Amino acid sequence: MGEPSDEETLDTLKSERSSQRGSGPPDLPPSLVKVVCADDLQQSPSRHWLEGCEEVRVLRGRSGAVRQEGHSLTIVLADRYASVRHLLLRRAQDAFVVLDEGSTNGTSVDGRRLAAAEERPVQTAVLEVGHTFFHLRTPARGARDAPTDERTGDPLTLNPEFSLTLSAAGRLARRAHDLLLTGESGVGKEVVARWLHRVSGRQGTLVAVNCAALPEHLLEDELFGHLKGAFSGAHSDRPGLIRAAEQGTLLLDEIGDMPLSLQAKLLRVIEDRRVRPLGGEREVPVDVQVIAATNRDLQALVAEGRFRQDLLARQGLLRLPVPPLRARREDLGLLIRQILREVPEGLAGIRFEMDALRTLLLHDWPLNVRELRRVLLAAVDLARTEEGKAIVIGPQHLPLTASEAAPPPRRAADISLSAEDQVLRTRIVELLAEHRGNVAAVARALARPRTQVQRLMARLGIQRRET
């Protein structure tokens, strides 16, 4: 079978937007993603579809195999910190019940350890088994398969909804359609645009323009170019960035910040593929694919008179949402690997303490992938000791404030604690009373980093008023 038609691709995008609004039916089985192992970043993330599964077991073994027997799935981990009987997921209508099967190190759900014999129903959660993190999602909407990064062989995403978006976007890019990428700041819209350019097969380069970075008169010259003598200082012809993207892709980042006067000229380029340089009387034909990106609500800008309705209708017809990082936690393993490949030590030379990796997986990432990148690269530099030695990233190396790194505290009555955690909780409460609520002093007494103690207080439901 060939690729879907343009009409079928458009229907796919419309269906996805309906699903995101909650009106579309769940069209995929639940998924369980092995996100990342703290001790071995070279292990690739993997996704398991739980189609027809009534029970899922995760346990330690040598093979690292996956076995399906009837309605039961067994995932075997080569993780020495997991137990030979560890995690059980049991289907319960539209959710799964999580149980620990008597493991040595326990099982945690969203950073909270399960008590003995506790049965916790969840739909979407981060699960800890030994030193390996999983992400459970049920129900799932979107596509089973995602495009791969041709440079690494890794999938671009393990999130079903984002998989659907990228698959449709790739088909449209190969047919030279103009596209609009939407999403919060830092979600990776430019990364998506560069991938779309690579898969489009266009022979020219990708030229990126930040529409918010330049004042109006400079932006016009940058985009459209000028002829010699067009204005004072124009000593020679300049083709401009639109023409520089000939047979390639023009990325207009932050298009919502483009001045109104330039929007009319841009519309002419998009509709007729012709550009008139400053000081010129003739229009020059151009062959460019236009990808725009914005973190703004363009329809709201239209209502305010700050964005042209006709430009939105033309460029915004094929709108591709890039989800925030907090909505696709199953991608954190892929992104961590992608970012840390850039450091000299490589993936083989870096591992994480569990508290640090747990913080990364549970953090809400308000600044998205851009923030993750900043945090990881800074953590590597802070954790680096001697040349050639392995890097071990702990929570003290993560440049996140305590309020960012720790989840909100819960009441003790809402938490089921193991005997070990009960002892630890009592000790921290006693130390807080002894040191009059000084967390730094408690951290010194426990020989732990202050940020780790703050996270323990949140996990164990300790409020300062208890002291």
Regions found by a protein language model. Name each.
Residues 1-80, 90:
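Intrinsically disordered, low-complexity acidic Ser/Thr-rich regulatory segments
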Residues 1-23, 27-28, 36, 43-44, ...:
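Bacterial C-terminal helix-turn-helix
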Residues 2-21, 58, 91-104, 108-158:
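C-terminal boundary/linker segments immediately following FHA domains
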Residues 91, 197-204, 279-289, 297-404, ...:
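Nucleotide-binding/hydrolysis machinery
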Residues 143-167, 217, 363, 417:
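Dynamic helix-loop-helix/coil hinge segments at AAA+ ATPase domain boundaries and subdomain interfaces
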Residues 165, 187, 209, 223, ...:
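Conserved RecA-like P-loop NTPase ATPase core
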Residues 168-233, 243-259, 287, 324-329, ...:
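Conserved post-Walker A coupling segment in P-loop NTPases
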Residues 228, 261-285, 293-303:
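Conserved catalytic/switch belt of AAA+ P-loop NTPases
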